[in-house]
Amino acid sequence: MAGRSPAHGFCDDEQTRRLLRSRPPRQALAWAGACLGGPVTSARALRGGMSSAVHLVTARRPDGRRGQAVLRRYVRPDPDEPDPAAREARALRLAGAAGVPTPALLAVDPDGTQAGVPALLMGRLPGRVDWWPSDLDRWLERLAGLLPRIHGTALPPGETIPRFAPHRQENYRPPGWARYPRVWERAVEISRDPAPDLPAVLLHRDFHPGNVLWRRGQVSGVVDWLGTCAGPAAVDVAHCRVNLLTLGAEVAERFTTLWERAAGTVYQPWGDVVAIVGFLDDLRGDWGRERLLVEDMLARAVAGC
């Protein structure tokens, strides 16, 4: 969840910050250089998530030309997301082939034998993250329009895409600040029930404005495909809805209306329940006004399930 820091940047923990931002080790740079056709001359840390170190690397080729790529190293293993490099590489191939704007996959080291840890090398997309658009309606319309394109990606027979499973939490008790503890308790029960019988589509699983790049008012790319899986479209819609509470409840609802129009279907509130329960560990801190908006959204969703 982007939460109160829409920039979606690095963790405030100093040890984690060093792990994610420090210059990649020689082994990783040697692998990247071999893929790019020359030694790496620079590596600049990019903003990214919490499980991987992301750097823009520049290599000098024998003919004097420069080659640039994004090196992503999965330096923080997550038992809930095994084989991260292979999983993201598979997602990039599928979504890219379907016309979704994604980074070009240049190379993958699925087990870390060459780069030291599992790693991807990707083309660099133009554009930047934009959480505060000058034209909110157009921004929301284009954001919502991305999801049917992602969800329309064909899943080839025999393709091994993990099935959606809710994120596990350390503690499922209601947050200490909860006004409606019973709502939270019921939400946990719903999240543990079998998912509704809805069509399974390709999910980004971490779709929100912090993972969408823009250039001159147009979407230039969707990044961070680590959590890709197959499941109900409502999972992606809900994840984005909760993150959009940063901009207000009315913005989240407007996004949903635009998605329904683009997808030609009706949103299922089950998605909100699963998404918010999946944020429980993150929601135990001081979230100010946003925590009230999250709880109100959850109460409406529980009532609608």
Identify what each model region corresponds to.
Residues H8, A230-P232, A238-C305:
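Helix-rich C-terminal or lid/interface subdomains of diverse kinases
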Residues Q27, G38, R87-R90, R142, ...:
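Short, conserved clusters of charged catalytic residues that mark active-site
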Residues A2-V40:
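Juxta-kinase regulatory segment immediately upstream of eukaryotic protein kinase catalytic domains
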